[in-house]
Regions:
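Hydrophobic packing and interface segments
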Residues: 1-356
């Protein structure tokens, strides 16, 4: 509700403020004489900060619950408290990694922002650092807090988890988390490439404006359709690999892995509305034009980072929905569901992408 309601409110206020201010009244953007400006700034906080945070944290909680529910049917994972808590330890490692990543942004000399063009680069580097450190923490947690072999497929007859039809190793579970981690990074980078002014897709859309609004709309729509191809394949491969080796527990772990860098990705996502509001405050308080130029440069980078956050939210939601479904089926000991074949679901996701 926060995402949808807040998003509609944001865009309605934004478009309304621009139409009334720029087109009808002839006053600049974020001018204090336009009351809709306040609604626009508040809407950014509701839709892009509170709404996105609620969405991602909801997916995070759901993936944690799904992995714990699926793990509860395994006798080996129930043998020790540490084995059962493996999903939560993966999340804890991600939080610690994101905390350490924040020091790279503020304390490492080579990563400090000295020019406008470095803003977007430094934000992207933080995603890389967070993903690498989360990968290392996942390997360590897998080594110490998982048994060498554990049951992942329990037969329909033995509901107490004693009759096992499939086993997985600790390193297979580790691979599932790492696949989710790097699939999330890939989705973020593809989103960055497709929405950043530093790369050719956005530059081509900008150039198409020379021939009119119709061409611009067609170019933008085509770019949006084309941008889903690689993220869909990343999700499909992650689902297939995770399910193939660790069954539904692997899918839940992959979703958890994608969300383990949540602290960093949500911080980067909130950067956009914060800089947008900073520009609005600079305009309303009558600060110098030089200040507005700087906030506009930061806002341009913030628009890209906001798109990266949306990619994370959509990708993680796809994995979490399958993980929750798998948790229900696993706990209910339902075995006759054809959708539970990894190649079937991966093909379903890829097939849904083909019309675009």
């Amino acid at each position: 509700f926060g995402r949808v309601g807040g998003g509609i409110y944001t865009k309605a206020a934004d478009v309304g403020a621009d139409l009334v201010g720029k087109v009808e009244a002839g006053i600049p953007e974020d001018d204090p004489r336009n009351p809709a400006v306040i609604a626009d700034n508040v809407g950014d906080n509701v839709g892009d900060v509170a709404g996105m945070g609620a969405d991602l944290f909801g997916s995070f909680a759901e993936s944690s619950c799904a992995s714990l529910v699926v793990a509860s049917v395994s006798k080996e994972l129930n043998a020790k408290w540490g084995y059962m808590m493996f999903p939560l330890l993966v999340s804890a490692g991600g939080i610690l990694s994101s905390f350490i990543t924040s020091f790279f942004a503020t304390s490492v000399p080579g990563l400090k922002v000295t020019e406008e063009k470095h803003v977007e680069r430094n934000l992207s580097i933080q995603l890389y650092i967070s993903t690498i450190m989360s990968t290392i923490s996942t390997v360590i947690v897998s080594y110490f807090f998982l048994p060498e072999k554990f049951c992942v497929v329990v037969s329909e007859v033995a509901k107490n988890g004693t009759w096992c039809q499939g086993y997985a190793s600790k390193w297979a579970a580790c691979v599932c988390v790492v696949c989710g981690l790097w699939a999330g990074l890939l989705i973020g980078k593809i989103t960055d490439y497709m929405t950043s002014y530093n790369y050719s897709p956005v530059q081509e859309v900008s150039k198409s404006c020379e021939t009119g609004a119709a061409t611009n709309i067609i170019f933008g729509l085509a770019l949006g359709y084309k941008s889903v191809v690689i993220p869909i394949f990343a999700l499909a491969i992650t689902i297939y690999v995770s399910f193939r080796y660790v069954n539904m527990y692997g899918v839940a772990l992959a979703a958890l892995g994608m969300l383990s860098t949540l602290s960093t990705s949500l911080t980067i996502d909130a950067y956009g509305p914060i800089t947008d509001n900073a520009g609005g405050i600079a305009e309303m308080t009558g600060l110098s034009a030089n200040v507005r130029v700087k906030t506009d440069a930061l806002d341009a980078a913030g628009n890209t980072t906001a798109a990266i956050g949306k990619g994370f939210a959509i990708g993680s939601a796809a994995l979490v929905s399958l993980a929750l479904f798998g948790a229900f089926v696993t706990r209910s000991h339902i075995s006759g569901v054809d959708l539970l074949e990894p190649i079937t679901f991966a093909g379903l996701v890829v097939g849904a992408m083909l019309p675009y």
